[in-house]
Amino acid sequence: MIRRRLIIAAAAATALAACASGISNAPAPAPQPATTGSHAPGKTEVLWLGQAATRITTPGGKVIVIDPWLTGNPKTPPAFKQLSALGKVDMILLTHAHGDHLGDAPAIATTQHVPIWNGGGMGPQLVSLGLVTSDLVQPFGKSGTVMPFGPNGPKITAVHAEHSSELVWKNPATNKNESHYGGEPVGYIIEMENGFKIWHMGDTGLFSDMKLIAERYKPDLAMIPIGGHYTMGPQDAAIAVRDFIKPRYAIPMHYGTSPMLRGTPDEFKAALGAGATTAVIVPDPGQQVAF
């Protein structure tokens, strides 16, 4: 009888441990996308606007705009095709020079007199082609870290992206498109004032050093391309998230803007599998997510 009780107790303890293990490995509760409103102090707010275009409002109220392809973007809500709808912008980040990422950055920079930052050497080319004036470019090095708002503000690090970065420019003298060097493609690790970290991956294929970058910076949220053709598709994006990065949250991006970008969020979630520990958040363009 004593032996039978011991066996039952051991089985119960094993079951309890398994339950506890399941709880610890469950996806983090996902914040729900919502319509935009006034900034909630202490929160990181992420507004995805289609493709890779993103507006991040930091807990301290700084507004960082990434890859603002808006006026020509079929996924951008009509309201945000008016660039003034972005509100005051404190910083523009560009991951690379392709038109669906460079987008409206020169117009926003010029109108608001806010600098364009790039970690891969694009800035001098923007100036030489007359897209912006030299005072509106703030280049920094790939793998470099900047703190443009001081030691207590957000911290931005440029990290590797496996992509290309041609800058296609229409020469006004010939009315023909020309292809120019656009610097190196990058992604950005953005650490907020409260320590919350976002990895905006820009355009990238799968590469093994995603694991090293994730171990070094430990991002809470990965904004990851899933459309395929030019970037990772759902399967590779799932490998990146599940096996290399392991963030608490993931927002899929860079899909659905052209027939070539066929990957979908549902395919991405299916590829991750039922045991994934990352909560996938799928906002509609123009919906804001607060963390």
Swiss-Prot record:
UniProt keywords, alphabetically: Hydrolase, Plasmid
Molecular-function GO terms, alphabetical: hydrolase activity
SMART domains: Lactamase_B
One Pfam family here: Lactamase_B_2
Transmembrane segments: none
Family the UniProt entry places it in: Belongs to the UPF0173 family.
Protein name: UPF0173 metal-dependent hydrolase Rmet_5695
Species of provenance: Cupriavidus metallidurans (strain ATCC 43123 / DSM 2839 / NBRC 102507 / CH34)
